[in-house]
Amino acid sequence: MPTEKPTIIYTITDEAPALATYSLLPIIQSFTASSGINVDTRDISLAGRIIANFPEHLKEEQRIGDALTELGELAQTPEANIIKLPNISASIPQLKAAIKELQAKGYDLPNYPEEPSTYEEKAIKSAYDKIKGSAVNPVLREGNSDRRAPLSVKNYAKKNPHSMGAWSSDSKSHVSSMAGDDFFGSEKSTTISGATEVKIEFVGADGSVKELKSAFPLLDKEVIDSSVLKKKALVEFFEKEIADAKEQDVLLSLHMKATMMKVSDPVIFGHAVKVYYKDVFAKYGKLFEELGVDVNNGLGDVYSKIESLPAAQKEEIEAAIQAVYQTQPELAMVDSDRGITNLHVPSDIIVDASMPAMLRSSGQMWGPDGKQKDTKAMIPDRCYAGIYQAVIDFCKEHGAFDPTTMGSVPNVGLMAQKAEEYGSHDKTFILDAAGTVRVVDASGTALLEQAVEEGDIFRMCQVKDAPIQDWVKLAVTRARATGVPAVFWLDENRAHDAELIKKVNAYLPDHDTTGLEIKILAPVEACKYSLERMKAGLDTISVTGNVLRDYLTDLFPILELGTSAKMLSIVPLMNGGGLFETGAGGSAPKHVQQVEKENHLRWDSLGEFLALAASLEHLSSVIGNAKAQVLADTLDKATGEFLDKNKSPSRKVGELDNRGSHFYLALYWAKALAEQTVDADLATEFAPIAKSLAEQEEKIVAELNSAQGVKGELGGYYLLDDVLVSKLMRPSETFNAIIDK
């Protein structure tokens, strides 16, 4: 039952991790109950967030509280102890699908208005837009990020190396970025002296002024910057690179972050779609406009909107799309069997996951023929693209990394209070005319300004001083704790980074850095330095801004461990609480498809095990609950045994899946609790549980595995049926009887 101040909050999210929670949470609650630890839940799923935001449209019994806002407030208190599982960062197609499902279940929700005309439609769109994209993490992340591979996981990877594609020195794979007129080239940055408030305004060529964003506060010593990506240069870049991919006979791919960068990146994606399929848009552009095709939602939107046309006309357009593939370079595929290309849906290929996957697979992606091929990876903006080219160059020269000997690159990331680009959505604008965009303070002084033309993307970012100080402190703390070099990935030739370098140099002397190796290197140089050390089996801490935090905590774990879901991801909240994120991967929709088809869930809950141990440890140190420390230590021991005995889920139906892996964690955890000598009460409590689980192992595993091989009934996709899914995810009555005692 919820209490006024739940001790640990376990989040209900989406897709595979949400299914896993139905099996794992009862085990966690059972094991922690006697230690005076309350494990409560909050629903921050996509469906839950939609329902919470439209109470006025719903019946009383359908309404639920706004858990995300509540957790955002909790994150600013010392009591916060939140275990955060991956959730959907909804693209527009996903948002619409969730709305449609909820409407079918009797929720009287409004449709998502893509082109709102009335005040009411604009308000509805605005409410939905707050739910779309990466709407959860920025609210909860009231601290900086400490992500690393736990020793047990690293040792497991060394003993059980994942496959790494071989690299050839004559690989044609490469990264392509704009030569200029991108965010990197146009960036201007300044540090605020004295608190003020600013507004963003557009000044037209005729001198008329239009307010883009009304006044909002800036704190003393805050770093702000503005930049522009030019539409004309972007379109020329796509034209040139598409032709070059054809000439070099490599796959063409585009790697964006349309989920998090929900204003700018879908627009960039849309330009790529229009340029690649230019013949189709030249011929049918007017019709597409009438049909309401939104190219920013990808080619998939063309396919869904032409569904309403007469068969002959629809087939004519489909044939025209197919004809494009005769003249244009082959596209990298998301699903070659179903003909889903890189350009179908903006959220299908996300740079932080797609680039490491390519780098792990010999620098190749899958082509339309279902085979791997060298690839041109288009990452238009130059801010961070160079790090991926550095990995390609390194692997071409030295070959693939060896997981049995390679070092590790943990990360300390500047993230708190919506730092940098990941907090820029409400300050990003697509301009509809030429002129100047200015950031103007209370006295009317323009702090930053950028010349713009029609279609250009303007962006303003900010990062507050307190998070920067905390970030520098965390970097020194981790360097001291590990004894390995810490490298700030900052480029003195980039405007924003130059401001940050001044601050890093000012705040480092506040800490004892005696005997520590701390460097500041531009991202490409920092990457090369880290790769060389990694090859030699040495560890290097990367200390980065918010975007590189995201990119590197996928890149290095995928190379080191084969996945980013096995990372320990701790956010020491700035007011003393703790946020524990379970891995750095997504919510694995393909895993859900397999459950629906054959009731086998291959989701690996290792991230949840690691986060829970860190959460219990935090609880112990903050409120002095000694039992929590015993639970944490024994859970760590159990996780080590779980890995050593290889009890992670199999991909194949009929074999151990997520549910079976939870049984083994419970068995090893109960055993560790029974054997420990620190707390006699816990040892006495768990000895019979460990004995029962061990004696019934064969029967329980048989019950769990025999439940597979049939369709998994979930009663929904975005809004699961609690009763059905609980039954589905806990099919062993023998196991349940022991756990639920």
Kindly give the residue locations of the regions a language model identified:
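A glycine-biased, small/acidic residue-tolerant capping/turn segment at secondary-structure junctions
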Residues: 701-718
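Extended, well-ordered protein cores
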Residues: 2-270, 279-502, 507, 511-529, ...
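C-terminal accessory extensions/subdomains outside the catalytic/core fold
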Residues: 720-741
